[in-house]
Design a protein with these regions (language model features):
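Structured binding/interaction patches within domain cores
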Residues: 1-148
Length: 148
């Protein structure tokens, strides 16, 4: 994957953005597959002891906001509680799903909130949403080809 990483890092910014969007579409599909298997995703936030229900549409809204280049549907505010809960271990997902969630979160911050986020971090997280490690290289190759 090293030569692919180098290939990605040498892309112009608009092509990197395209790769990010392509890979995060896949991450979103993994998120949606997971959500479809859950009746409801909820947790207890330990600071105040409140019961929270996960907003399963938030990652899709994050992707949409990233595409548009601005925060649509108050995504930044909606992410505050679940990200804190993940960091506090109040909310847990299987590793690939957590990677998908973070990939979409970081994509949002880079392209909608215009924050500095490492380009490779988004790629790595989005690829890690794929449980089948043998597919990751092909995913990145395909995304780079489609973007250029």
């Amino acid at each position: 994957m090293n030569s692919l990483a180098t290939q990605f890092k040498e892309l112009p910014d608009p092509d990197k953005r395209s790769v990010h969007l392509i890979l995060c579409e896949h991450a979103l599909s993994k998120w949606r597959e997971y959500c479809a298997t859950q009746r409801r995703i909820d947790y207890v936030e330990t600071v105040c002891g409140t019961h929270q229900v996960v907003d399963t549409e938030l990652p899709a809204d994050a992707l949409h906001s990233a595409r548009e280049g601005c925060d649509i549907k108050n995504v930044a505010k909606r992410y505050q509680e679940p990200i804190a809960a993940i960091q506090d271990d109040n909310l847990t997902f299987p590793d690939p799903i957590e990677f998908a969630y973070y990939a979409l979160y970081n994509l949002f911050h880079k392209y909608a909130a215009q924050e500095i986020v490492d380009d490779w971090l988004i790629v790595n997280q989005a690829l890690s949403s794929e449980e089948d490690e043998s597919q990751r290289r092909t995913q990145l190759e395909t995304a780079i080809q489609r973007a250029t």
